[in-house]
Amino acid sequence: AVGLGAVFGFDFPENFRYPYCSASITEFWRRWHISLGAWFRDYLYIPLGGSHVKPVRWIFNIFLVWMATGFWHGAAWNFILWGLMYAVLLLIEKAWLLPYLKKHKIVGHLHVLFFVLIGFVLFDASSVADFWDCIVSMFGGGQIKPVTTESLYYLKSYAGIILTAVIGATPLPVRLYGRLQKKKGLKQTLDIAEILLLVMLLLLCVAFLVDGSFNPFLYFRF
């Protein structure tokens, strides 16, 4: 979206700042969908009093803001529960868990990835019952086996894309590129390589669009 906006002369701020590198849900929501979080903070959370109120009122503010965030995505129970789930997680972190997560970064990363994954399932579920069936199956309690021939086939087929996505979800490529640019004699070579890489990515995206089936925009259903 930032690149597309730049094509038309608009300078959009960064909206996602490596959220999967977060070590807490609190940090995750400072990095994920920054513009949405800022809007709810400025126009709902702060007018309600924010955190400068009594504890009971502050808890109420958190729940109301996150229930509204879920409702913003869609008028269905799974979206409301999705928002309330994050409200509970944020309150638990602010109450006592956050200092522990800051000291144990690996545990914090696993904590984030686990609950974000659960949140995505809840977000995309057609109903609460559908969400529960998916969760049961994910943990081996349903009829779907955790490992099948089909799942191994897809894992093998898309291993390269998955690895690229994992690396791209971290700031490592940007940091490496910045260090290489500082070295003498490499800037011109990197500029040419960047153009070639962007052209290759454009062609790859077009190839996927041509080969893939029609997939309507997610928010059209809300």
Task: Indicate where each model-derived feature is located.
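Membrane-embedded transmembrane alpha-helical bundles that form the catalytic cores
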Residues: 1-221
